[in-house]
Amino acid sequence: MDHPKFSIIVPVLHEAERINDLIASLRQLETENNFEIIIIDGSPAKDTLHVIDDDRVTKISSEKGRAKQMNAGASVAKGDILIFLHADTELPSTAMKRMNAFIDRNKYVGGAFDLGIKSDKMIYKVIAFLGSLRSRLNRIPYGDQAIFLRRDYFNKIGGYREIPLMEDVELMRRIKRSGRKIWIFYDRVMTSPRRWEEEGLIYCILRNWTLQVLYFLGLSPHQLVDFYKTDYRRKRS
């Protein structure tokens, strides 16, 4: 394959049932540029990697942890633009066309997309709207909004901090402090509602808001993950 313009980096953990559908959806994206797909499995069993049908996909394993996995993917990426995609999120069909035209004409170092949730329920539409509005106001999109960055800039700032939570927020805050800008497209990624459905909608919303507030108040991600695990065990007991 010629030098790819884009590298789509997908950290996974036990996504064997979902991964081939995701890869198929990525192959349908509208683009005139070459792109590569890199799947990074955080499971020692490599169960997701074993079921991938597409032999064009770059498959690697790493230590568990989204930040560690994304950094591992970025370390082997060849594309000029890195797209960090969650396994339960789909890009809009014109995503790469939009990124290509925008990045080539502007001095922004990267960006993300508005949030969409694959559900007809009004509550999810409200969650998506508020999430998109928040990221436009504070310029800190979350990982489920398909963050993309120029590879040279990503390497320059040292990639993701390998912390257990809030790696996306920490990266965006670091970019803001450096004086660089990111752009958020009105085009929407579509993410699965599964985490809200599995954990309980109200619980998930309140837990996430609590974590965000505590993080912005100065608690470290390592303290937050202890809270997360304790709260999760309490809910399951």
Name the predicted role of every residue range.
Residues 82:
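Short aromatic/hydrophobic "clamp" motif used to bind/position activated sugar donors
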Residues 1-3, 173-237:
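Hydrophobic helical membrane-anchoring modules
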Residues 41-49, 89:
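A conserved acidic beta->alpha catalytic loop
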Residues 94-123:
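Conserved donor NDP-sugar-binding/catalytic core segment of glycosyltransferases
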Residues 49-76:
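Conserved donor nucleotide-binding strand/loop of the catalytic core
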